[in-house]
Amino acid sequence: MAFYVRRNNFDAEDSVLLAVQDYLRWSSTPFRDREPAGCVFAVFESFKRDASIVFRDNVRWLVRCSYKYVDSSESLIRAMLRHDNYITEACAVIGLLAQVAEYWGYDNPIPISARVIELFMRLIADYEISHIRSVINIRLQCFAPRKSRNI
């Protein structure tokens, strides 16, 4: 079922939406049951740092509130976005939702991942998808294996 979990590259024909959905499903799976992830998911894991930058001290609170109050958490998340850096904020939303999936999905990952994916689809605008693609490709360069240099 996981299409992107072991991927180390992200090509022009790859779907950002499917990759993020796959990542959010993977995030809701208990750690002991997760498949080892490739570089694409390592990039998505780096989005959690963006969440801590954008949402600051509210990350834990938002994670705890998001399960029971999905609809109100959407409005809370929107209210905390300043819209001064759309790219970082889009990545932060993905990072935050991954933390929600991890926190709440442990015992029952399928309904949790479905709720988190639904929330993701409501929070991310279409124009942000291409920006997320750019971030994935740029950050993948950081995770690419270093070629040894012969001096």
Curated annotation (Swiss-Prot):
Pfam family, one: Poxv_Bcl-2-like
Gene3D superfamilies in alphabetical order: dsDNA poxvirus
Signal peptide limits: none
Recorded superkingdom: Viruses
Family statement drawn from the similarity comment of this UniProt entry: Belongs to the poxviridae B14 protein family.
Name this protein carries in UniProt: Protein B14 homolog
Organism: Rabbit fibroma virus (strain Kasza)
